Each structure stands twice: as C-alpha cells, then as structure tokens.
Amino acid sequence: MVITLVGEKLAKPGLEFIYYGPGEPCKTCRLARVCIGNLEPGRRYKIVRVRNIEHPCPLHEGKVRVVEVVEPAIEVLMEPRYAIVGSKIKLSFVECNDDDKAELVRPEGLFEGDLVKILEIVDDVECGGRKYKLVKVMREKG
C-alpha cells in the first residue's frame, strides 16, 4: 500500500491511473515527497481508499486528496509454456504486430524484465498465426 495525493475530482476508490512523472509545479512543492515521491513513473496504480484530508494544489485545479493506492493486476499476453498459475517469471513481451492487441502485448504499468506472479489464465489469443495465453499478473517488488 502506498500513500499519495491525487486531484480531488479523481479521488474515487477503484480508479486506476498511470503515473507519468512530475509536472513542473511539483518540483518546488512542499508536498512532492508524499505526492510523487512514492510513485514510479510508468506504473499503474489503483485507488483503494480515499482519506478525508485535502491540500491545495496548483496542478489539480485547486485541491488534492490523500489516497491509498496499490499496483493492480494487469493482463498481458504470454508464451503458453510460461503461463503457469502461481509461478513467478521475468516478464518478456511477445511479438505481435496487431494494433488491436497492442495494450495486451505491452500493457502500460509493466516493463520488460519485471518479475511478475501469474494469478490467472484469462483466455487464449492468436496473433500473427501464433497462439498466446492472456494472463493476469501482479508485479513482484524487489
């Protein structure tokens, strides 16, 4: 669980977002350490709890709220031989040039080489004549 700040209009349990890095006003903000200091650029986060604390923010149209976030499970295509529920593997993206499947091939929030735990096999997917497994994974830290 990570504590961070999000714009009050976005502060809703269940909302997912990608953190892309600090905005210009963040570089001099006194709350930057708690707001962006706990987030990794390029990672996906899901709000699990909104606390009743708010702060002024020049970036988020007035105010930000304190929230608790986690990295959610993410769906990704994988070679069938690696798709074993419960196993932990180093993520290797598959080759698939179908634009409709781009978000499953290289989903935002995951990077090549991440250590992930396979939680569930969701579906079988074909791309370019090859068969892959669509799996739900959770990134393992450290």
UniProtKB/Swiss-Prot annotation:
Record-annotated disulphide pairs:
none
Highest taxon, organism lineage:
Archaea
Q: Which InterPro entries match?
A: UPF0179 (IPR005369)
Q: Tell me its family.
A: Belongs to the UPF0179 family.
What name is this protein filed under? UPF0179 protein PH1477
